[in-house]
């Protein structure tokens, strides 16, 4: 009988610790020390939330930088079932897969070796918010033409916003870069 009582007490204590106190402590630490990150790293522009630093968006206008292709078409709507309800993830297709090759040809004119790898392939999550600085610099002439500014001005904007990669190439956040373009004075 004593063993059963000890087992029940240990179960209740473990449930309170792991199911209530630990999550409460982690939530408080997150809200106090990492408020921005714990709440989705949201970006506000013109007094409205326009996106998150952590989630890529689909950009199509020529006056904006375009992010990486998305294997899930930037689907973040759980009601829109895409690929059996998956709203994030890579394609898991091999290099020889005909669908992958067709998609890459769609994003890149076949035979054009002047395209960065991140402009032609999706990320592992399918929602990557960053592109390489090299990719951004290759898009700069198109954006400069669309906005009637010099390419060097757009390139300076890219260099000012670049983030250093540790084991990767330098990169920029596409949403932050596009907001900076909109804020740019003529």
UniProtKB/Swiss-Prot annotation:
Coiled coil regions, renumbered to chain: none
Membrane topology note: Single-pass membrane protein
CC annotations in GO: plasma membrane
Top-level lineage group: Bacteria
Keyword Transmembrane in record: yes
GO BP field: potassium ion transmembrane transport
Database matches in PANTHER family: POTASSIUM-TRANSPORTING ATPASE C CHAIN, POTASSIUM-TRANSPORTING ATPASE KDPC SUBUNIT
NCBIfam families xrefs: kdpC (TIGR00681), PRK13998.1 (NF010602)
Reported function: Part of the high-affinity ATP-driven potassium transport (or Kdp) system, which catalyzes the hydrolysis of ATP coupled with the electrogenic transport of potassium into the cytoplasm. This subunit acts as a catalytic chaperone that increases the ATP-binding affinity of the ATP-hydrolyzing subunit KdpB by the formation of a transient KdpB/KdpC/ATP ternary complex.
Protein name: Potassium-transporting ATPase KdpC subunit
